[in-house]
Amino acid sequence: MWCCNARRGVKLLSHNPNKNPINQSRIRNLEMDDKWIIHFLKKVQVGHFVTMDKNQPFINPSSFWYSSKRHEIYFHSNAYGRMRYNAEKQSNASFECFRSGKLLPSNLALEMSFQYECVIAFGTIMVIQKIDEKKEI
């Protein structure tokens, strides 16, 4: 939680999203290599897919499967519903999955935190229509 009041002379903290490409970590020394990411994607069972409906983001938890052959993430959704509708209207999407680590308690609520590992991906989403292609995957 951040609460800053500029009138009291508090310096506002900011992050410039244009400083680095948007798909790069803000803290470079915490980035993981492709080998770690692939191993992690094969262990985690649930991810969160984000699609867009005009300007409204929509997040949906789902089981998924990572194909190291195609370097793609696959999931199954309902033939009708928000995810399917969004995927057919706009292909921009993002994905996140994580695994919780240790709780890092503190006597001060704002300093409490927890450790975690995660993968975040940006890309496009598409509906696989053909039965033959579904079977191949």
Regions flagged by a language model, labelled:
Residues 78, 98, 126-128:
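Solvent-exposed residues in well-ordered beta-strands and their adjoining turns
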Residues 48, 52-53, 83, 126-131:
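Short helix-to-loop capping/linker segments positioned immediately adjacent to catalytic or ligand/cofactor-binding
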Residues 19-48:
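Short, basic/aromatic recognition patches
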Residues 2-28, 102-137:
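Charged, gly/pro-rich active-site loop segments
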Residues 9-13, 36-40, 58-73, 105-118:
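Short N-terminal helix-initiation segments at or just after the protein's N-terminus
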Residues 44-79, 95:
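Short beta-strand segments
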Residues 89-90:
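Short nucleic-acid-contacting surface segments enriched for D/E, G, S/T with interspersed K/R
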Residues 80-85, 94, 102-103:
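Histidine-centered metal-chelating micro-motifs
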